[in-house]
């Protein structure tokens, strides 16, 4: 059950936007990872060569925005820290790790074998975690 809060809702999350140098490459990476439709017609966003969207099956929309001279975060380097990260639920960490590495992700922290998550970077350098459901 979703908790009910006394304060009125001011806004609804429409999408999460990731800056990158290659909108086609990064939207393709996340499509292979999460499924969904890249650049599904949607009046909320324009689809030009500087922007792409991914409408996932779960209803979450990721957007990818081309930024000239994009400098990705370097987790855990405090000189270029992450601004956010995605936690993505998986049933089998080992199997999911194999898939994301084949897609172009980089393993940043495998952690303790008993730990329920692992940290990766997507092809543009954004950290994300695979978390055991």
Q: What is each stretch, according to the model?
A:
Residues 14-16, 84-85:
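Short active-site oxyanion
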Residues 1-8:
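Short, Lys/Arg-enriched N-terminal segments with co-localized hydrophobic residues
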Residues 54-57, 120-123, 133:
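Active-site beta-strand termini and strand-to-loop segments that position acidic
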């Amino acid at each position: 059950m979703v908790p009910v809060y006394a304060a009125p809702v001011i806004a609804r999350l429409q999408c999460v936007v990731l800056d990158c140098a290659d909108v086609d490459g990064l939207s393709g990476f996340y499509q292979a990872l999460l499924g969904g439709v890249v650049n599904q017609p949607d009046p909320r966003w324009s689809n030009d060569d500087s922007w792409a969207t991914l409408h996932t099956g779960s209803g979450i929309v990721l957007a990818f925005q081309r930024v000239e001279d994009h400098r990705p975060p370097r987790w855990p380097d405090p000189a270029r820290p992450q601004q956010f990260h995605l936690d993505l639920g998986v049933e089998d960490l080992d199997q999911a790790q194999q898939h994301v590495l084949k897609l172009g992700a980089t393993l940043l922290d495998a952690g303790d074998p008993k730990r329920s998550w692992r940290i990766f970077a997507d092809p543009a350098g954004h950290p994300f975690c695979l978390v055991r459901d």
